[in-house]
């Protein structure tokens, strides 16, 4: 159990290190107005905090920096509350005040405002793709043998596949096929499309179009393929602006994680409980994120969490501001999604 004096010194050390990025020594602490102790007392308390594992020495300075244990205690018990400025609130409101017709644009804008307000890398995981509905289908001929099948969902998600056109099928057959698809499948949830295409739509096509099988099977594959929600990033390059990541060899594994996206997707998909979660350093299960903190928040419609937004940055992160921004964006995004779903 830390004493009140130790708690104060720990908080001031972490606040100062987050702000400056420089190790904090007893001389620096003695100049802080909230620290009214002698230099000897400060040194003794810092030695105790180091022995307890909350702060640690660096090789390049006599000062101390927070350890992962120190950051965890700070986030759980010492985090000072922070309010957003009017300008911040207005920026967030302006994003969600716009009328947005495609869900993917809404998610991308959410990622952008998070990155802009925090100067870290932001991530937004879209709502479950299988909950989307078919909005429109097109088949665009490329030549006599091939065409591109384009599928658009109500969220703005677009999938396309190259399909082989049977020699017995002409442009009129393709047009008729597209009309049947759009008439029978518009508004159908993607999760139900495969069954509907294999039964009801196939029966109609069988009566009107010869050799429809190969085109239909390719379209079924196109609609059945995307099982992972889309991940939206903003501010990827912000990582390189952090002093901790100035060594490109150290940051390369992290950049690989960001570029591959799948690992980040799986990480965010596990965030199903409402609220904010903070993972610090080695608490992150992905190799390459040992020097990072990942702060995630869920967004929802009603009581149902739909997805997550997150901020990825160094362990020397402005936790209070990031958590405040995430909470506000998650709240406004949830409200915007509720309106969007009601309008569909």
Swiss-Prot record:
Belongs to the HrcA family. It comes from Geobacillus kaustophilus (strain HTA426). The keyword Cell division does not apply. This is Heat-inducible transcription repressor HrcA. Gene3D superfamilies: 3.30.450.40, Heat-inducible transcription repressor hrca homolog, domain 3 (3.30.390.60), Winged helix-like DNA-binding domain superfamily/Winged helix DNA-binding domain (1.10.10.10). SUPFAM superfamilies: GAF domain-like, Winged helix' DNA-binding domain. GO terms for biological process: negative regulation of DNA-templated transcription. Keywords: Repressor, Stress response, Transcription, Transcription regulation. Pfam families: HrcA. GO terms for molecular function: DNA binding. Negative regulator of class I heat shock genes (grpE-dnaK-dnaJ and groELS operons). Prevents heat-shock induction of these operons. InterPro entries: GAF-like_dom_sf, HrcA, HrcA_C, WH-like_DNA-bd_sf, WH_DNA-bd_sf, WHTH_transcript_rep_HrcA_IDD.
């Amino acid at each position: 159990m830390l004493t009140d004096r130790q708690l104060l010194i720990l908080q001031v050390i972490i606040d100062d290190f987050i702000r400056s990025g420089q190790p904090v020594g007893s001389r620096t602490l003695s100049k802080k107005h909230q620290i009214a102790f002698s230099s000897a007392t400060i040194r003794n308390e810092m030695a105790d905090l180091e022995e307890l594992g909350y702060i640690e020495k660096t090789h390049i300075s006599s000062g101390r920096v927070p350890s992962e244990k120190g950051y965890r205690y700070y986030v759980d018990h010492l985090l000072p509350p922070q309010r957003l400025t009017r300008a911040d609130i207005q920026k967030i409101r302006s994003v969600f005040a716009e009328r947005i017709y495609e869900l993917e644009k809404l998610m991308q804008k959410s990622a952008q405002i998070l990155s802009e307000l925090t100067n870290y890398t932001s991530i937004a995981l879209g709502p479950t793709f299988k909950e989307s509905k078919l909005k429109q289908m097109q088949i665009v001929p490329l030549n006599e043998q091939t065409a591109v099948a384009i599928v658009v969902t109500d969220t703005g998600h677009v999938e396309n596949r190259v399909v082989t056109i049977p020699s017995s099928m002409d442009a009129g057959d393709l047009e008729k096929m597209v009309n049947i698809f759009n008439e029978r499948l518009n508004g159908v949830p993607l999760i139900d499309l495969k069954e509907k295409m294999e039964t009801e739509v196939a029966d109609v096509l069988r009566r009107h179009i010869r050799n429809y099988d190969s085109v239909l099977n390719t379209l079924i594959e196109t609609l059945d393929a995307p099982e992972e929600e889309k991940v939206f990033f903003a501010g990827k390059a912000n990582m390189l602006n952090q002093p901790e990541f100035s060594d490109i060899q150290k940051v390369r594994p992290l950049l690989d994680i960001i570029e591959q996206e799948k690992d980040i997707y799986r990480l965010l998909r596990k965030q199903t409980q409402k609220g904010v979660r903070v993972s610090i350093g080695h608490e992150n299960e992905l190799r390459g994120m040992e020097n990072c903190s990942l702060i995630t928040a869920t967004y929802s419609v009603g009581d149902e969490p739909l997805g997550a937004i997150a901020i990825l940055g160094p362990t020397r992160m402005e936790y209070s501001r990031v958590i405040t921004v995430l909470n506000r964006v998650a709240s406004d995004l949830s409200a915007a999604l509720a309106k969007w779903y009601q309008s569909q």
